[in-house]
Amino acid sequence: MTLKVNRRSAIIGLSATLATPAIAQVQLPAANQAAAARRNASSFVTQDWRDHFKTLGKGVIVADTFSRALHYWNADGSDYRVYPTSVPMTDELTKRGYTEIVRKKVGPTWTPTKAMRERDPALPDFMEAGAGNPLGSHAMYLSWPAYLIHGTHDTRKIGRRSSSGCIGLYNEKIAELFAITPIGTQVRVL
């Protein structure tokens, strides 16, 4: 018997071969599908405020340094937002745990810490608000001294390990978050 292969047969055979991985992927057990869904299309890990806080209080923020995202929920939980962030350059610069927003400032000034100046002696002693200021357009100060959630004029930093300990957002995103976040908002840094 002779096997005759025409173009249609070859295309059908190739299509079936290429589709097999997709079919196998759809047939994952439910437990594996749920685990795979924990990351969204932007690769941020999905967070639930209940995993971190007993109540929403005035609102809550989860700053996830691993997936480089900030999650915000308002006081009644009806407003949930997620923002891409910059995170500390090293784990040694990262403070993790619970804190809260204690002060907010539009057009923050910047004074490098002693540790920053030791790492880079060329840093200025003080910097007024403006385009060269690394704190960007808005800053929300945490109860931990020298730790902030702030903007940045250098958009290349977002999504990267680039800060000296703070959580940075695009200026337009920190302005949005600043407007809806009251002093007293609970914060957890992971």
Residue ranges and their predicted role:
Residues 1-17:
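N-terminal secretory signal peptides and thylakoid transit peptides that target proteins
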Residues 1-2, 61, 165:
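Short N-terminal micro-motifs specific to bacterial/archaeal maturation
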Residues 3, 16, 67, 105, ...:
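Short, flexible active-site-adjacent loop segments at beta-strand->alpha-helix junctions, enriched
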Residues 22-24:
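Sec/Tat signal peptide C-region and signal peptidase I cleavage site
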Residues 27-115, 128-131, 138:
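Cell wall/extracellular polymer interaction/catalysis modules
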Residues 56, 90-98, 109-190:
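Exported/periplasmic cell-wall-interacting domains
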